[in-house]
Curated annotation (Swiss-Prot):
It comes from Saccharopolyspora erythraea (strain ATCC 11635 / DSM 40517 / JCM 4748 / NBRC 13426 / NCIMB 8594 / NRRL 2338). The keyword NAD applies. GO terms for molecular function: inositol 2-dehydrogenase (NAD+) activity; nucleotide binding. Keywords: NAD, Oxidoreductase. Belongs to the Gfo/Idh/MocA family. Its EC number is 1.1.1.18. InterPro entries: Gfo-Idh-MocA_inositol_DH, Gfo/Idh/MocA-like_OxRdtase_N, GFO_IDH_MocA-like_dom, MI/DCI_dehydrogenase, NAD(P)-bd_dom_sf. Homotetramer. The keyword Oxidoreductase applies. The gene is iolG4. PANTHER family: INOSITOL 2-DEHYDROGENASE (PTHR43593:SF1), PTHR43593. Involved in the oxidation of myo-inositol (MI) to 2-keto-myo-inositol (2KMI or 2-inosose). One of its GO terms (biological process) is inositol catabolic process. This is Inositol 2-dehydrogenase 4. It is an enzyme of class 1 (oxidoreductase).
Amino acid sequence: MSNRELRVGLVGAGLMGSDHATRIHRRISGASLVAVGDPDLERAERAAAGIEGCQVETDPLKVIEASDVDAVVLATPGRTHEPLLLAAIERGIPVLCEKPLTPDSKSSLRVVEAEVAAGRRLVQVGFMRRFDPEYAELKRTLHAGALGRPLLMHCAHRNASAPPGFTSQMMIFDSVVHEFDTTRWLLGEEITAVSVRHPRSTANAPSGMTDPQLVTIETASGVLVTVEIFVNCGFGYQVRCEAVCEGGTAQVGGDSGMTTHVRGAWGGSVAPDFRPRFQQAFDEELQRWADAARAGGIDGASAWDGCAAAAACEAGVAAQTSGARTPVQLVERPGLYA
Ligand SMILES: NC(=O)c1ccc[n+]([C@@H]2O[C@H](COP(=O)([O-])OP(=O)(O)OC[C@H]3O[C@@H](n4cnc5c(N)ncnc54)[C@H](O)[C@@H]3O)[C@@H](O)[C@H]2O)c1
Ligand SMILES: O[C@H]1[C@H](O)[C@@H](O)[C@H](O)[C@@H](O)[C@H]1O
């Protein structure tokens, strides 16, 4: 397999899936898109348009089970991931699953158990910040040790507006799930407890949602991480993280790029959403996943990482309503992920 192109099937052709379709077809090497599955036929057809020989299905299982599909990219909503992941594991093919692995820890654990039973890592979770050059540099800097031990991290995660149907719980398991993963990945330790506080809400929040929310994450060694999650901030997409260490600080996600001076004002621009902000990270993620899949492995967050993030999300969702500091319940890490 390592000498020939990876034949990829895409399941879910919405915002993220169609972006990945273009990426597989045009921006990465060693892989081609051979099938797209979405219950919405028009979306599937649009994603496959112009790609010679790319078949279109309305039944996602037909893509996962197609004999000419070597690997799958899963870009359906998180609540639909479990059965699709289990089907890919059953068939023994690699799958890049968009975050979250699943929205709750019980279903995430079932995915981990299926992979453990299969005896090999097939699932990679699409935590793309791990491939962002700024985040990668922050990780290298923290691990090099010149700043001393990390004590605190301050994160801001802002979206211009939440899509219809987005709930308060999704602010945790669909959005803050990124900070749960980056915390574990940057610091190399588990999350032990989560608290959530609610400041005065923006009038732009739909009914039933208070927005923004302030999440506090505690880690095993006692680092505290604050996350402002604000999904209807109105002005654009902004993701920041500042690590405060014994000997200094390091920050990523600040304003950079071109600034202009025009009509008596100066300034730059803010990305409208995750696609331009993390394009380089997504490209790198897909390239490294495809290379690893051809070699029979994964190169990124594992199903275990997705499961640990889901356990933190579950504590976060409970903390949202109780107002209490909520410990994270995480099972022991299976040997497959040592
Ligand atoms: N990494 C990131 O920054 C990032 C950004 C956006 C979305 N995502 C993730 O990507 C996934 C998709 O999000 P989106 O914004 O593209 O959603 P979307 O609603 O735009 O698209 C989802 C698509 O999945 C299809 N679908 C629904 N159920 C299905 C099923 N059972 N089988 C096959 N297709 C099904 C829908 O018809 C739709 O076309 C989610 O897991 C989301 O969290 C990740
Ligand atoms: O699915 C999206 C995506 O993961 C974005 O990166 C995040 O900023 C949004 O909050 C989330 O809803």
